[in-house]
Amino acid sequence: AKFFRLSIPQIKFREDLGIKHGKHMLWDNDKKIGSNYFIARLQEAGIECYEKVNGERQPRQTHRSHIKMKDIIFPIVKFESPEFQQVHQWLNGQVITETKGVFDGLNVVYGGFRFDFGTGGLHGCISSGYVDSDDDCIILDADVGSYYPSIDIQYRLFPAHLSEKFCDIYEDVKNQRFSYAKGTPENAMLKLALNAAGFGDTNNEFSPFFDPKMTMAVTVNG
């Protein structure tokens, strides 16, 4: 009974969407809801996401034998400190064949803080402990709304097999999302669509959004 009560918001979310779009979504996970919506938008625009291979329906994809880092690091990315300039130069000379665990151990200590680099982006964390604000210092928690989707749109990133039309549809979905109030089923569904198509499923080998070069362009620059 407790599990059911906790599940009510998710059940209602799927029921409301199902009624509006005329589909049964009760058993779909969040990512599938988002992916299916974006796939429908692409196919409405004449962009095929699937093809027949030996009589079986298969997702269209772009596979990469290797990815040159210099091809995905944006020209706008520049550093002033020698420590970061050295890493930037080194990364531009790398060619990767995998998308995970490639740059383990690559880091820079700057200003007493350690920055770790990887194919998932730039990360850093202070040592565990208690932090409190005072008269001289405040704790600032900053977030960027739709950060990865904004990178996709600003730099026109798209899975190679889906053409640049992907970018226009993607931007329209983002604008559409913000036309709905936060907390509405529509807003939630469009957020799922943006996250799946513009990032999460670009490295999913079972998805029609699969193109690891796009994944790396988003995470390394973002």
What are these regions (language model features)?
Residues 94-222:
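Helical catalytic core of nucleic-acid polymerases
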Residues 1-145:
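Conserved "right-hand" nucleotidyltransferase catalytic core of DNA-directed polymerases
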